[in-house]
Amino acid sequence: GAQLLALMGDRVPRAMLSGLPLQQQWSYRSTGDFAPDYYLETDADLYYYSFTDAHIAMTYRALTPQQQARLDPMITGFNPADMYAADHVRRVLTTFPGVFTGLGEFSVHKEFVSPKIAGDPPSLTDPALDRLLDFAGEVGLVTVLHNDIVMPFTPPENERAYLDELKAELAEHPN
């Protein structure tokens, strides 16, 4: 928090503060004593790291009210393919009242990241995402969603593979 504010200086009046939602698994069978800190350094899975939300909240609470006024903390430690995602967000809001402004940035279709995530990959057509977005709309959470429009190595006829799904999802959840 304080480091970000120092970096912002006087030129940036306000910024979004998000934790990293995915953690690279350190698989000894894959990398031995080398602890990977980037998703391309190993073939091991990525997993959703829910502690990131508590870390952001505690960091934010340690700031002065003037410093807090310049930051918008966001919830990111949920799996958008999990029907429990909305419940996780509700629990974070209850545990840290008044801290969080919204959700995100979280990814649904993200080129080389999505295939590395353990479990079901997020999808724009997943009811879990609908449930999450419905809850965000009900409680007034700003939502920042990252969704690639194209797939890697897409043939020209499928160039914008996810665009129609994205438009439909946004139309279904206008709030």
Predicted stretch roles:
Residues 1-131, 135:
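Mid-domain alpha/beta scaffold segments of enzyme catalytic cores
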